[in-house]
Curated annotation (Swiss-Prot):
Belongs to the DNA mismatch repair MutL/HexB family. GO terms for cellular component: mismatch repair complex. Keywords: DNA damage, DNA repair. The gene is mutL. This is DNA mismatch repair protein MutL. Signal peptide: none annotated. One of its GO terms (molecular function) is mismatched DNA binding. GO terms for biological process: mismatch repair. The lineage of its organism: Bacteria, Pseudomonadati, Pseudomonadota, Gammaproteobacteria, Lysobacterales. This protein is involved in the repair of mismatches in DNA. It is required for dam-dependent methyl-directed DNA mismatch repair. May act as a 'molecular matchmaker', a protein that promotes the formation of a stable complex between two or more DNA-binding proteins in an ATP-dependent manner without itself being part of a final effector complex. It holds the Pfam family HATPase_c_3.
Length: 619
């Protein structure tokens, strides 16, 4: 077959195969265009889950009549004009591919009007064939109608799923968008019935977070707001005991754009590593903000993925921020919850939707949840921007100020004797009153009853003390009497050669002895009884994939957790009131004491009002 130039309609239909996967893809592209046009309200009307009709109506800036034919041409856009614009793009869309791709596989109508125009205009396209632009009555803003999606591409249409499934994809995308843009009013109707309405608000008013993710999520949320090295991470993560069976409540936004990023997800999972029950997943809504020039958003047809210029710095920043947030939690301390309505006053209000910007453009989500540690100074101070060449300096800024050690500021209560104090001075976990079946400690607190699993609690206390002790002496190495030869892939050998200093800091002395072989001369002393060969392979795999590894630290922590478990007080051991109170005070002063080393909860609170309801008091 000879080489030939494809017709424009076929080119657009091929492009539609990348951009328009299903009705949810159409809704995504059109609503993002509305947001880029400054809309504060978007109405989405669907019939047959978008297969029969998708109508998107917004109150944005609108377009002039003469711009309508341009809007449906490939690579025609108002958002970029040069390579510099592309490298610093802050809008959700920028390629100019969505409208022509959608119009080529549907019966397409575009209506728009600017506020300064006397009337609007309408343009109809069927199967890629443009009609005439004619005057049309229309409110300021834009309306796009997409009818009979894939009517001229039967092979694509037969791959669509059931109506309920396709509608579910649209609703899930709408939830993700509503989280990123709390000041946007979003209405979703299906077959003439209003199914979702997200009212405009902000994160402090908690309405949207509860509406989308539920009260349990909102009341277990820990606020995150951390800046440094030209980066900012804010949003919320939930306490470990709210973990999920599936990773279905994990939302990440980069400069307001919803994305999936394996490196960031890996960093969050590592931060939860020793407080999460096996097989469970954390839940979070996180917003990462950085200079648009430091992230490439033009790497995926649907813009679901991005590429960071310094992925290792991002990974470390996210890990330390989330890990630091979790480390601030103490047994008895209520979460810094989103949704309890405890933030008032003008100074507590988040900035407006146009506040976050690195290049003069609007930067998507810009709300603030406040610092994860209201009582301590920020861990890091931000700097304006960092180039790849300045990465070492960025790392120095990132690690310049270690997290505040609250342990040093809280006195250890060893006597366990109740203090002569008023109700306002009752400790968070109260005072012990009894032991239940030799397993649980019962304590009276200011507003009810505390129940503590004494083995789980003592296990966490011992574990954290062991970690601090080993952190203080550093990681010691043990030379091997006979060097160990390790056969690896050439790529892994390259990583070992380039990361020799990193491996040395982890306790491994490794030299390359051939294209695919390594000589291991020393290993971490604490892990000498483990399987150093398998551990080193895992370390090389992490360094290759993420540029960062915590395998040695995790292996060390696993060993220390086992030691702490064996050294913890056993069930059915009788404790005196003083011993129980000492354990409660240690819990209040120990990081992550809300969970044992295996991720199980260590305590529970029953309020007096809850207990009253058990006995129908006050009715």
């Amino acid at each position: 077959m000879p080489i030939r130039q494809l017709p424009e309609i076929l080119i657009n239909q091929i492009a539609a195969g990348e951009v328009v996967e299903r009705p949810a893809s159409v809704v995504k592209e059109l609503v993002e265009n509305a947001i880029d046009a400054g809309a504060t309200r978007v109405d989405i009307e669907l019939e047959a889950a978008g297969v029969r009709l998708i109508r998107i109506r917004d109150n944005g800036h609108g377009m002039a009549a003469q711009e309508l034919p341009l809007a449906v041409l490939r690579h025609a856009t108002s958002k970029i004009a040069s390579l510099d614009d592309l490298e610093a793009v802050a809008t959700l869309g920028f390629r100019g591919e969505a409208l022509p791709s959608i119009a080529s596989v549907s019966r397409f109508t575009l209506m728009s009007r600017r506020a300064t125009d006397e009337h609007g205009a309408v343009l109809q396209i069927e199967g890629g064939t443009l009609g005439e632009v004619i005057p049309h009555a229309h409110a300021p803003g834009t309306t796009v109608e997409v009818r009979e999606l894939f009517y001229n591409v039967p092979a694509r249409r037969k791959f669509l799923r059931a109506e309920r499934t396709e509608l579910g994809h649209i609703e899930e995308w709408a939830r993700s968008l509503a989280l990123a843009h709390p000041d946007l009013e979003l209405r979703l109707s299906h077959n003439g019935k209003l199914s979702r309405r997200y009212k405009p608000g902000d994160w402090y008013s908690d309405v949207r977070l509860i509406e989308i993710l539920g009260e349990d999520f909102a009341h277990q949320a820990l606020r995150v707001d951390h800046s440094g090295a030209g980066l900012r991470l804010h949003g919320c993560i939930v306490q470990p005991h709210y973990s999920r069976l599936n990773a279905d409540q994990q939302y990440l936004y980069v400069n307001g754009r919803p994305v999936r990023d394996r490196s960031v997800a890996h960093a969050v999972k590592q931060a939860y590593s020793d407080v999460l029950y096996q097989g469970r997943h954390p839940a979070y809504v996180l917003f990462l903000e950085l200079d648009p020039a430091r992230v490439d958003v033009n790497v995926h047809p649907a813009k679901h993925e991005v590429r960071f210029r310094d992925a290792r710095l991002i990974h470390d920043f996210v890990y330390r921020t989330v890990q630091g947030t979790l480390a601030q939690t103490r047994a008895g301390t209520p979460p810094l919850a989103v949704g309890v309505g405890d933030v008032e006053g003008e100074g507590a209000r988040p900035p407006g939707r146009h506040a976050v910007s690195f290049s003069g453009r609007r930067g998507g989500a810009s709300h603030v949840l406040g610092s994860y540690s209201a009582s301590t100074a920020p861990l890091m101070q931000g700097v304006p921007s960092v180039s790849v060449a300045d990465a070492p300096a960025a790392y120095a800024a990132l690690y310049a100020a270690p997290p505040t050690q609250v342990m040093d500021a809280v006195p250890q209560m060893q006597t366990g004797l109740p203090l002569a104090a008023g109700a306002g001075d009752v400790p968070l976990l109260g005072y012990a009153i009894a032991q239940l079946h030799g397993i649980y400690i019962l304590a009276e607190c200011a507003d009810g009853l505390i129940v503590v699993d004494m083995h789980a609690a003592h296990e966490r206390i011992g574990y954290e003390r062991l970690k601090r002790a080993h952190d203080g002496i550093g990681l010691r190495t043990q030379p091997l009497l006979v060097p160990m030869t390790l056969m690896v892939a050439e790529r892994e050998a390259d990583v070992a050669e380039c990361e020799a200093e990193t491996l040395a800091n982890l306790g491994f002395e490794v030299t390359r002895s051939g294209p695919g072989s390594l000589q291991v001369r020393s290993i971490p002393a604490l892990l000498s009884q483990a399987e150093p060969e398998m551990l080193l392979r895992d370390v090389l795999s992490d360094l290759s994939e993420h540029g960062h590894t915590r395998r040695v630290a995790e292996a060390r922590d696993t060993l220390l957790a086992t030691m702490a478990c064996h050294g913890a007080v056993r069930a059915h051991r009788r404790l005196s009131i003083s011993e129980m109170n000492a354990l409660l005070r240690d819990m209040e002063a120990t990081e992550r004491s809300g969970q044992c080393n295996h991720g199980r909860p260590t305590w529970a609170r029953f309020s007096l009002a809850e207990i009253d309801r058990w006995f129908l008091r006050g009715r």
